[in-house]
């Protein structure tokens, strides 16, 4: 562009180049503004203060024409006035904006894109082209995984055999024996035998299974900190609590086991009994147990907000004295002197039978010294379990199991047992047979519950009831024929865990059991062994506590049938 001498053409080309290549639009705004040289000329036209023009005048000033020998010193020549010719203006500013005027446009830019127009690429197109070039370069590159083969060191350099001097036992062993018959090696023992003889005997901790409830080793689980006073420790150690941290989901029984585990580690000399002997009691700050019952073993420890508890042996439970009135009246007043005397005598007799160790004294005077302490512990544990079962038996509880009808079809039912009645409600299913109505039977009409058969994981449960004149909806599981030797066979003794007949065997009872004026029917259920045992224990415990005439009559008739069967054999 330096070869061009047309200043107007150069300015137009520069102006249009900047405007066409600037994406921001700022260049076009500046260059299309007013003509600055004209404004400058109008403002300083007559003042003569143009700085650029002044320097241009000094650089091109003419030499003096005078012939004098003395040069002019400090002579100030007035500057010529500024002219419009001294400024180079943008061309085309004073012209019209007519599109047909070609002098206002650049000579290299076409106004119509159809005719030889060049469109600038966007940033996206440039990036796509760069990615395409990078992919082409990557296609020509081959990746090779370099794996250096590591030579394993020789094991002989690390494991050198060390020559040890022979011990006394080996020297005695290597010495030739004088007599070939002398083969005894008395006095020679290995180091392991010597260490085992010197080390104390370490028995396995029987409470080790409760160590998993330690809350100090758990991450992301809720824990609970409790201060437990140990009542079995001596007096100096009893006043300071044992601080434990257990998981919040641990039950009271598991907390007791964990406390026993910590006690066995911290106080190994203190003898501990089984978990059935201990209970957690509410306590005060001064280690005084309150006169409240212990915490329920089945409840989680997070349910109770106590921070201090006491682990002590269970307090002896007084036996429950019950007076039965065999009369036809539903209730009887206790205002008579005879009734009060009988009740007081029964209470005094029950209190006299209680001994200090929680057991019952022998009224005959026989000494109980022949029983070992281990037998007494087992008997005490059994009484505790029986007492807990008696307390839990009247509570309402539901079980999910299958009922078997006379066609050996199984239906899912819900069995509800409480101290007042039993309820059988069929679960909703999408099978083709219709829905049966629920059955509710008072507990007074229930005679017996037994387990007929025990398999690997299943058990067959039977519940005997008193038959009504109108058979209920579930009566399809039993027939209504009177009992005789050829129709039914009562499997006596099957509830004690013996082998009984299955419903498909010939010895299975499919009829009713009746005596003089009482007719019995039964329901057969198929469930797992654990659920069957829970139902058997719960229902029989309720029946034993009530001791109804119906149950006694049923057991009497069953014993008679068993005796007749044994006589026939």
Curated annotation (Swiss-Prot):
Here the segments flagged for biased composition (Basic and acidic residues) are: 169-180
Question: Which stretches are tagged as biased composition: Gly residues?
Answer: 361-371
GO biological-process terms attached to the record: apoptotic process; cellular response to insulin stimulus; dendrite morphogenesis; positive regulation of insulin receptor signaling pathway; positive regulation of phosphatidylinositol 3-kinase/protein kinase B signal transduction; positive regulation of synaptic assembly at neuromuscular junction; stress granule assembly; TORC2 signaling
**Subunit text:** Component of the target of rapamycin complex 2 (TORC2).
Could you read off the lineage of the organism from its UniProt record?
A: Eukaryota, Metazoa, Ecdysozoa, Arthropoda, Hexapoda
Which residue numbers delimit the SIN1-type PH domain? 395-545
List, for all copies, the residue spans of the domain called CRIM: 189-314
Q: Where is the composition biased (Polar residues)?
A: 187-200
One function term, GO molecular function aspect: phosphatidylinositol-4,5-bisphosphate binding
Location of region: Disordered: 52-82, 169-200, 355-377
Question: Could you identify this protein by its name?
Answer: Stress-activated map kinase-interacting protein 1
């Amino acid at each position: 562009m330096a070869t061009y001498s047309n200043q107007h053409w150069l300015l137009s080309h520069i102006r249009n180049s900047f405007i066409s290549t600037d994406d921001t639009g700022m260049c076009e705004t500046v260059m299309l503004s007013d003509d600055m040289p004209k404004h400058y000329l109008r403002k300083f036209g007559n003042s003569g203060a143009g700085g650029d023009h002044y320097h241009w005048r000094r650089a091109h000033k003419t030499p003096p024409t005078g012939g004098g020998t003395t040069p002019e010193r400090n002579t100030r020549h007035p500057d010529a006035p500024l002219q419009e010719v001294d400024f180079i203006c943008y061309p085309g500013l004073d012209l019209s904006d007519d599109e047909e005027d070609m002098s206002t446009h650049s000579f290299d830019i076409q106004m119509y894109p159809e005719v030889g127009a060049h469109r600038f690429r966007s940033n996206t197109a440039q990036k796509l082209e760069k990615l395409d070039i990078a992919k082409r370069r990557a296609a020509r590159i081959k990746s090779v995984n370099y794996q250096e083969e590591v030579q394993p060191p020789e094991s002989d350099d690390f494991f050198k055999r060390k020559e040890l001097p022979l011990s006394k036992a080996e020297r005695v062993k290597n010495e030739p024996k004088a007599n070939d018959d002398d083969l005894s090696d008395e006095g020679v023992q290995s180091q392991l035998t010597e260490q085992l003889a010197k080390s104390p005997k370490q028995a396995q901790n029987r409470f080790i299974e409760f160590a998993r409830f330690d809350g100090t080793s758990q991450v992301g689980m809720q824990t609970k900190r409790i201060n437990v006073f140990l009542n079995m420790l001596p007096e100096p150690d009893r006043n300071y609590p044992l601080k434990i941290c257990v998981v919040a989901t641990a039950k009271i029984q598991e907390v007791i086991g964990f406390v026993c585990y910590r006690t066995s580690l911290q106080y190994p000399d203190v003898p501990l009994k089984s978990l059935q002997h201990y209970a957690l009691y509410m306590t005060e700050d001064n280690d005084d147990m309150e006169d409240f019952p212990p915490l329920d073993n089945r409840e989680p420890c997070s349910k109770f907000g106590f921070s201090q508890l006491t682990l002590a042996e269970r307090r002896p439970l007084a036996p429950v004295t019950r007076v039965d009135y065999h009369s036809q009246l539903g209730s009887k007043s206790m205002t008579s002197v005879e009734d009060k005397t009988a009740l007081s005598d029964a209470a005094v007799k029950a209190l006299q039978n209680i001994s200090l160790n929680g057991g019952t004294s022998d009224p005959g005077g026989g000494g109980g010294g022949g029983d070992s302490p281990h037998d007494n512990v087992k008997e005490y544990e059994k009484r505790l379990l029986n007492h807990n079962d008696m307390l839990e038996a009247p509570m309402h509880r539901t079980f999910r199991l299958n009922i078997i009808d006379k066609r050996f079809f199984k239906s899912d039912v819900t069995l509800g047992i409480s101290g007042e009645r039993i309820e059988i409600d069929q679960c909703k299913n999408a099978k083709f047979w219709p829905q049966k109505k629920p059955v509710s039977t008072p507990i007074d009409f229930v005679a017996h519950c037994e387990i007929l058969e025990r398999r690997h994981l299943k058990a067959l449960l039977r519940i005997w009831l008193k038959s009504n004149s109108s058979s209920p909806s579930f009566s399809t599981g039993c027939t209504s024929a009177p009992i005789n030797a050829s129709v039914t066979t009562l499997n006596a003794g099957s509830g004690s865990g013996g082998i009984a007949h299955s419903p498909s065997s010939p010895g299975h009872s499919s009829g009713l059991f009746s005596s003089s004026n009482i007719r019995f029917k039964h329901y057969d259920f198929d469930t797992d062994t654990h659920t069957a045992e829970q139902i058997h224990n719960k229902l029989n415990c309720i029946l034993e506590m009530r001791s109804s005439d119906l149950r006694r009559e049923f057991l009497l008739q069953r014993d008679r049938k068993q005796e007749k069967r044994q006589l026939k054999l």
